[in-house]
């Protein structure tokens, strides 16, 4: 598989790397988290100006219409810096769902707002009893004479839900899963944000006869499509984070001395670093496999490639994160080193957008189809 960037992709990667080197140093990332939580409006606007938020949105709606391969380039750079803003749920997932499943009027209304950074979207599909099952939603939607539809239910672990002002919400409509748009300031909306272990944020979303706009009655297909785009982006971001963590670890082993020699000179540690690099390369390869799957005409092929990428990337992320902590010794357990931030982010790779058990089952189902 050829990972060579096109000229435009290389320019985009270079500009993003310069941006995060300036705005996302370890100290600035920690300060932003303290002052702004997991969302800094200034950074969000800058990402919009650089074309990150509109990358996959059609040009007629203010975006650039780039394909999944370009998204891998972008997410790899954002992952290297552990960028905290909700690019994946707010732009990648929401943009994919609205671009392919929303009626033309909703596309014209909301896609330009995503590309410009004017609106921040979040995906509210998980519930306490669903265990990642997309079609097991207990939230329900009913027609309303005044508002089109109203939704009742509670959504949990909404990724970046506290920063969002718009929600894509799954709910049962006439017994089938549908997807709706809900505005944060709509009547009956209650948002309870909380921090997650990776210094990001989740939220619980309670809806009590909340007015909603129908995006599509084919909610299961739309939800799967959007989440698969999010997983491909997540795999690329994890590969970028692993890449940077390996660099940090190599720098530490080169500087730290034991028995009068740098730790990097010990062959056993060199072998462990080589294993970390192999896992990182495998994860990057699988990010491109997932990106290829997004273009597949057959949904089963898409499911197979995306779920395989998710499982392998999650395993690689855990391995690289754990090895980095161990190679840093006792310092790896402290909060003062950025290795801990990378470890936490990589650990979350397994549980975001479906865990390994779910995707192993999904992969096997796609293989049998």
PLM segments and residue spans:
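Alpha-helical interface subdomain recognition
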Residues: 1-82, 101-106, 113, 117, ...
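Short, conserved beta-strand segments within well-ordered enzyme catalytic domains
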Residues: 53-57, 73-75, 122-124, 168, ...
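N-terminal glycine-rich flavin-associated loop
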Residues: 85-105
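A short core secondary-structure module
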Residues: 124, 148, 152-189
